[in-house]
């Protein structure tokens, strides 16, 4: 079993000047079967949103704190059909609401941008010392900028999703307009050739991921709000 951690750091909010030390970790978990595939995250797995004054947080609306990008690289010993899925280990801390523009959920910028508002696609950011839910974040696949290969052959690939992946059974893969990871391992994404919905085996792939976050209002006057989200991304074999 190979594990790689993605840490979303520095997005604490302070009433006083201080150094951010909070992290939201996303573990990439792989079960080794058949041809082993190894995942690696760029930048040492760290996504940094920086530190902010607590005064930046709205008392009336949820606050969008922006997006950050990171790459996930998967390398397989031989051409392998794979899919990725995720689960949230802080699911009970997820909270979502409307921002100052009246939009619900987390704002992303990929493919023209939009909002992720489905609770099954929003990960929790932990709780304050007063046991209030801090907010939510989404992890989206940048389907337009994936690179993949099968040995020395470069592949043109996109992404398709399905709500069930069971070895030995056919899957109803479909292309979508956005590809946010699900929080409860209820949805899977695989590589497909453009215009097709049949999984295509790869030996190497680079998957750009965009992480977007939103912070709740009415979190109180704490001097420090520390994010504490954790998800696990799993690579499964088809």
UniProtKB/Swiss-Prot annotation:
Keywords: Signal. It holds the Pfam family DUF1120. InterPro entries: DUF1120. Residues 1-20 form the signal peptide. It comes from the Bacteria. One of its GO terms (biological process) is DNA damage response. To E.coli GltF. This is Uncharacterized protein YhcF. It comes from Escherichia coli (strain K12). The lineage of its organism: Bacteria, Pseudomonadati, Pseudomonadota, Gammaproteobacteria, Enterobacterales.
